[in-house]
Amino acid sequence: MNVVQRTPAPATDVTDLRAALETDAKSLFQIEPRMTVRVGVVARSRDEPGAVPVILDPVLSYLQDLLHDFHRSDRHAPGSALGTVRQYAQDADADLRLVCPLSGPATLEAARVAREAGLPIEAILRYNRQTHREILAPDDRISFDTALESPTLEGLLELDTISPQNSRMARRLAERSVIAHSDLVIYLGDAENPSNQEIGLALQEAKRSGMLVMSMCGPQRICLWEPDTLAVDPAEDGDWYSVVDPEGQQKLRHALARMLGLPETPPSTATPEPSVRTPWGALIGGLRSAWRAVFGPEGHGSSRSEESCLEDFYAEEARVGGNHCGFYTLRWLFTENRLPRWSRHVDYRLDANLIGRPDADGSGEAAAWIETIDHVRQHCGETFAEGFEHILRRRWIYADNLAIHYSNLYRTAYIKNFALSGVAVSIALLSIFLGGLTGLKAIAVVVELLVIRAIIRTFKAEKEGAWHQRWMHYRALAEALRPSRLPALLGNVSGQLALTPSVDPGSNWVAWYVRATFREVPLPSGKLDQDALRRVLKLASEEEIGEAAKDGKQGSGQIAFHTSNHRRSYHLDHNLHVWANRTLTLTIVAGVAFVALYLLYTFNDSKLWKKMISGYKPLATVLGGILPTYGAVFFGIRAVGDFRASAHQSERMVRQLERLKLMIEGEIQDPHLHRTQDIFALLSKTLADDQRVWAMIYAEREVTQGF
């Protein structure tokens, strides 16, 4: 299977980017992931290479054939686990890569086999290349030099943080890094009796994470580990199946298909038998169709299938801005620090994230991840820099842009419906003052019906467009992609990510897409020494975590976002609560005034009091209806927005991020790779927990008619 380049690569020059933003922004993004599988190979340093070609060559050939078959089926015969939508990119062939530590005869021979097969190779060395070469046997140095000069070597990561005196720790880090950067691990030894405890533990962890694990099970046989269906411990409850046998090959095919999110068996082509509808069933179906025609789809937007969700995602368009300004209008009206001016146009920050907004003097707003981009271009190699830009950064920008768009659509819809419901009630009550003017009353009724029609149309549009569901999905995707750039700099982005299951069955495509994207991310090249770790830790501290704005200095990162969101959400919640109480208070005042006038009229039967109470009665009726209605509008917007919960969550996140920032700043003094990996794992978990809480807050906040 030949590896081909995708066509064409999105523009990277600033001038080209700016021109594309104005004409065809979608062309800047490679959205569909490339079908990719990374095969990691680990072995003892002293393992003999004799059996490697006999075992590895047929396995790699079989994997190539499987991927070619999967990719051809996805292209020409849609019928995936996600429905009939094609999941993977069609402008590039499937990509099979070999990841190995080049640590001895066996892994060097594995690299030679992959090189002759034309497969891309990504190598992770336990030391810098010079030290690594010195620890090899004289005969192995020639193979090592040949591997480094190979045109198929696409990534070379040198773990230069541990001295050769601590060879055990260095070997363990290299092996764990290979496994973390792989989707399928082949151990060139007996996994039941591993050559050392570290490899055994690493393989156990790989089994438990759901990774495919293969091992030698004889002189010229290799087997696949298959956990039992009801396994309590996937690392212990299972069996080995030889991939030479038909049963083992079938299990490997099914396991690889599951990992890629593809169907394990071809889709059924049988024609379903036509259903017989009774007259009663036809009547019910007609009533449901009439209901949907007026009010839109029944139930919540989560009824959309994974197929339609993924297909819609691929068909989306990146947007520079929009006119759905309901939430921004709400902020302008009900926050203490108002926006500079009200504007109907909402900026989605597509150009700011992609290329920045520099001023004439060179200052201004920088592009998103600009510090990380500079680090990648200087220290991580051209292949990684290109993959980082097009696979991680631009897909995050795309997902973030869509999330902003649909959040504005959704928020504008529910704010608009609540506000219009108040307008409809106001029109009905104000018609009291029209007296006997029948024509004007008829006009008022028509206007009220038009307002109600606008409410129903907004409700129907939200249901049909699934604005709420798309916002939830795209925000979850963006929040999964953004923090992944940090472990990617360490070559530690795992394709085995498992997102928290959602109550929305249509959201499973998000986890599939994130895993497919992570498998595409190439290995960075260069030395990963203490200086490199300090740079990466500094990026995590300053760019991802950031700091709050103070002393006239603009804030940055997640701390600045959560600080601002806490303040804004608190003011929104508080002011909506205050105005709702004010309307109820005014209702009480209006009612008390009417009762007082009535009592004065009762005890002093004069024409003056009679005239006053007769004139005030319609106004009291109108105020008694309109004021509570707008109080309910304020409370409804406050309840659906749930600004209080959002403010409290942001406050908690600021405290957690500040603790992580202190931990990172302490690690910068004397960084170690394994501790840095643990810190990034903790940071990713903290951000994932925040996303989970946010999803719980807004998952059931669907748009209503406002009544």
Language model feature labels by segment:
Residues T265-T585, V595-F707:
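Conserved non-transmembrane functional hotspots
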Residues Q5-P266:
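Acidic/glycine-enriched connector segments
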